[in-house]
């Protein structure tokens, strides 16, 4: 299971009839709101509840796929003595991850580099990627987690621009990396702007630890680094069910709480959830 750093609130709206889905950590709740002046019939409420359940199932399935893809790649690195760039690229292509998972924009490997070994690491990495450097080294840092290998779904040059960048330098990402290490499993960040994206699109990054294999079951080896994958929130919420729900409802996504400042996706650019008196009737509640 992915453990989200922040809460997400998701609203589905259609004219006077609206449905609200809360994702709390990975808890999802669907609420249906009834216009008091028009009193929708029970069959309409039931039909909307069924739609909310179907949406919940599809979202759960997609989140599981994101987590599984991230975990599988980290297991591949953990089980290998040394993964070469061509092996990483072949794995991504053979798995068809970008084709199967809409919104997934990139995968990468972030090795753990102790601060005292940066110069040696840069020399070794430079044999694979000439000119490799970890820019903007920080005082008092025990270790860096720079991008070494990576693939981007739409723009291969993006990886070259980011190669060597220390992902732990961004607080929201470092917090998720630390939690992934503690949980020994995939952890997602809060939504934030993608690095060096001209459109400043919002992404969620998922981190899974890469460890040295241990002989005994249940023992955790030393941390060798992290696998990350990034997911654009826009196609995730708009297209993950092939746009079927968008034909019937407006989807609104809030982070942490329902407020204008926390809105991260709105299908029709009209924030129905912020209107006074929106919440009325609870129709469905579930966890994913």
Task: Identify the function of each model-found stretch.
Residues 16, 30-38, 66-71, 163-170:
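A broad, low-specificity signal for short, low-complexity segments enriched in glycine/proline
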Residues 45-53, 78-288:
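Intrinsically disordered, low-complexity polar/acidic regions
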Residues 35-68, 74, 78-82:
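Juxtamembrane membrane-water interface segments immediately C-terminal to a transmembrane helix
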């Amino acid at each position: 299971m992915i453990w989200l750093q922040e809460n997400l609130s998701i609203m589905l709206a259609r004219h006077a009839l609206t449905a609200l889905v809360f994702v709390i950590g990975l808890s999802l709740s669907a609420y249906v709101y009834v216009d008091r002046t028009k009193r929708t019939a029970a069959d309409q409420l039931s039909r909307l509840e069924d739609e909310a359940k179907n949406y919940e199932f599809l979202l759960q399935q997609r989140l599981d796929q994101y987590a599984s893809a991230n975990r599988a790649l980290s297991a591949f690195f953990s089980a290998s003595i040394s993964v070469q760039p061509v092996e990483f690229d072949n794995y991504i292509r053979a798995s068809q991850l970008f084709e199967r998972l809409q919104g997934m924009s990139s995968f990468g490997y972030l090795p753990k580099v102790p601060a005292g070994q940066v110069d040696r690491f840069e020399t070794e990495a430079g044999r694979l990627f000439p000119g490799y450097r970890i820019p903007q080294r920080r005082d008092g840092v025990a270790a860096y987690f720079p991008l070494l290998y990576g693939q981007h779904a739409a723009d291969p040059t993006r990886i070259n621009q980011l190669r060597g960048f220390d992902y732990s330098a961004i607080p929201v990402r470092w917090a998720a990396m630390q939690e992934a290490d503690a949980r020994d499993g995939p952890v997602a960040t809060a939504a934030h702007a993608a690095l060096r994206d001209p459109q400043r699109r919002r992404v969620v990054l998922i981190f899974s630890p890469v460890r040295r294999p241990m002989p005994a079951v249940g023992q955790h080896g030393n941390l060798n680094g992290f696998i990350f994958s990034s997911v654009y929130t826009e196609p995730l919420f708009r297209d993950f069910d092939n746009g079927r729900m968008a034909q019937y409802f407006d989807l609104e996504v809030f982070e942490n709480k329902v407020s204008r400042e926390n809105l991260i996706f709105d299908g029709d650019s009209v924030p129905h959830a912020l209107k006074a008196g929106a919440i009325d009737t609870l129709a469905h509640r579930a966890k994913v």
